[in-house]
């Protein structure tokens, strides 16, 4: 979905090796995959993905199915892999900040998952100030 696409895009911009597991994806994921900037496994998350999960530094559970996200979180916790559950902040081991960039400066804005509106406003003001 849109959340996973945004996060995958940001991670690739910072040089991360990204794998997206999803039967369908938006234009940004498709374009990144075609450019070789991420790997796109075109299927729903399944047991065959456990091998890749075991090699992961971190995982983002951002499917449209809460039960699948919950299952991914459980699998990650069993393997001591930090995980972000896009639909449930209480199951997140880490959070994604709003990114404000004006090379060479990069600023991350986060409110601990408590006030996304505030984060958006602060990030917008920083972008305007840095322009």
Residue ranges and their predicted role:
Residues 1-131:
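Adenine nucleotide-associated cytosolic modules
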């Amino acid at each position: 979905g849109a959340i996973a696409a945004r996060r995958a895009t940001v991670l690739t911009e910072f040089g991360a090796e990204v794998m997206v597991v999803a039967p369908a994806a938006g234009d940004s994921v498709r374009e990144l995959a075609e450019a070789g900037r991420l790997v796109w496994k075109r299927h729903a998350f399944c047991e065959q993905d456990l091998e890749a999960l075991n090699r992961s530094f971190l995982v983002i559970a951002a499917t449209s199915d809460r039960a699948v996200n919950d299952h991914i979180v459980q699998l990650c916790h069993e393997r001591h892999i930090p995980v972000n559950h896009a639909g449930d902040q209480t199951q997140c081991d880490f959070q994604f900040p709003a990114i404000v960039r004006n090379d060479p400066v990069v600023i991350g804005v986060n409110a601990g998952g408590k006030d996304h509106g505030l984060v958006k406003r602060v990030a917008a003001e920083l972008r305007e100030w840095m322009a």
